[in-house]
Protein backbone atom coordinates (compact mmCIF):
# COMPACT_ATOMS: atom_id res chain seq x y z
CA UNK A 1 0.00 0.00 0.00
CA UNK A 2 1.46 3.34 -1.06
CA UNK A 3 1.91 6.03 1.53
CA UNK A 4 0.57 9.45 0.73
CA UNK A 5 2.50 12.52 1.79
CA UNK A 6 0.60 15.34 3.30
CA UNK A 7 1.27 18.75 1.91
CA UNK A 8 2.72 21.14 4.42
CA UNK A 9 5.08 24.01 4.57
CA UNK A 10 8.82 23.78 4.39
CA UNK A 11 10.57 25.24 7.41
CA UNK A 12 12.78 28.18 6.66
CA UNK A 13 16.39 27.82 7.78
CA UNK A 14 17.29 30.24 10.54
CA UNK A 15 20.16 32.56 9.71
CA UNK A 16 22.92 33.40 12.16
CA UNK A 17 22.32 37.12 12.80
CA UNK A 18 25.86 37.76 13.98
CA UNK A 19 27.53 36.02 11.04
CA UNK A 20 25.12 37.58 8.52
CA UNK A 21 25.93 41.11 9.73
CA UNK A 22 29.66 40.30 10.04
CA UNK A 23 29.86 41.23 13.71
CA UNK A 24 33.28 40.07 14.92
CA UNK A 25 33.08 41.14 18.57
CA UNK A 26 29.86 40.88 20.58
CA UNK A 27 30.15 43.80 22.99
CA UNK A 28 28.46 43.53 26.39
CA UNK A 29 27.66 47.26 26.23
CA UNK A 30 25.54 46.79 23.09
CA UNK A 31 22.31 45.96 24.90
CA UNK A 32 20.22 46.55 21.79
CA UNK A 33 21.96 43.64 20.05
CA UNK A 34 21.91 41.43 23.13
CA UNK A 35 18.19 41.96 23.72
CA UNK A 36 17.52 40.04 20.47
CA UNK A 37 18.85 36.91 22.18
CA UNK A 38 16.93 37.28 25.46
CA UNK A 39 13.29 36.34 26.04
CA UNK A 40 10.75 38.80 27.38
CA UNK A 41 11.25 37.24 30.83
CA UNK A 42 15.01 37.79 30.69
CA UNK A 43 16.14 34.25 29.87
CA UNK A 44 18.82 33.60 27.25
CA UNK A 45 17.23 32.02 24.19
CA UNK A 46 18.70 28.72 22.95
CA UNK A 47 20.43 28.21 19.60
CA UNK A 48 17.52 26.31 18.11
CA UNK A 49 15.33 29.38 18.59
CA UNK A 50 17.77 32.11 17.56
CA UNK A 51 19.57 30.18 14.81
CA UNK A 52 23.06 31.28 15.86
CA UNK A 53 26.10 29.05 15.47
CA UNK A 54 27.63 27.40 18.53
CA UNK A 55 30.62 29.74 18.50
CA UNK A 56 28.48 32.87 18.28
CA UNK A 57 26.03 31.55 20.88
CA UNK A 58 28.92 31.27 23.35
CA UNK A 59 29.96 34.85 22.56
CA UNK A 60 26.39 36.09 23.05
CA UNK A 61 25.98 34.18 26.31
CA UNK A 62 29.17 35.55 27.86
CA UNK A 63 28.27 39.08 26.71
CA UNK A 64 24.78 38.82 28.24
CA UNK A 65 26.22 37.52 31.51
CA UNK A 66 28.75 40.36 31.62
CA UNK A 67 26.02 42.92 30.90
CA UNK A 68 23.96 41.48 33.76
CA UNK A 69 26.88 41.73 36.20
CA UNK A 70 27.50 45.33 35.11
CA UNK A 71 23.76 46.04 35.63
CA UNK A 72 23.20 46.94 31.98
CA UNK A 73 20.64 44.15 31.56
CA UNK A 74 18.26 42.64 34.11
CA UNK A 75 18.59 39.08 35.38
CA UNK A 76 14.81 38.73 35.50
CA UNK A 77 12.30 40.91 33.73
CA UNK A 78 9.12 40.90 35.79
CA UNK A 79 6.02 42.59 34.44
Curated annotation (Swiss-Prot):
Matches recorded under Pfam families: Ribosomal_S18
Subunit and partners: Part of the 30S ribosomal subunit. Forms a tight heterodimer with protein bS6.
Superkingdom to which the source organism belongs: Bacteria
GO molecular function, one term: structural constituent of ribosome
GO biological process: translation
Xref: NCBIfam families: S18
Gene3D superfamilies linked: Ribosomal protein S18
Entry keyword set: Ribonucleoprotein, Ribosomal protein, RNA-binding, rRNA-binding
Source organism (scientific name): Streptococcus uberis (strain ATCC BAA-854 / 0140J)
Keyword Ribonucleoprotein: yes
Function field: Binds as a heterodimer with protein bS6 to the central domain of the 16S rRNA, where it helps stabilize the platform of the 30S subunit.
Gene Ontology CC annotation, any one: cytosolic small ribosomal subunit
Protein name: Small ribosomal subunit protein bS18
Gene that produces this protein: rpsR
Family: Belongs to the bacterial ribosomal protein bS18 family.
Amino acid sequence: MAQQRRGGFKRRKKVDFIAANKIEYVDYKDTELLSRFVSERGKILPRRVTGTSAKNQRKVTTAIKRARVMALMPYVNED
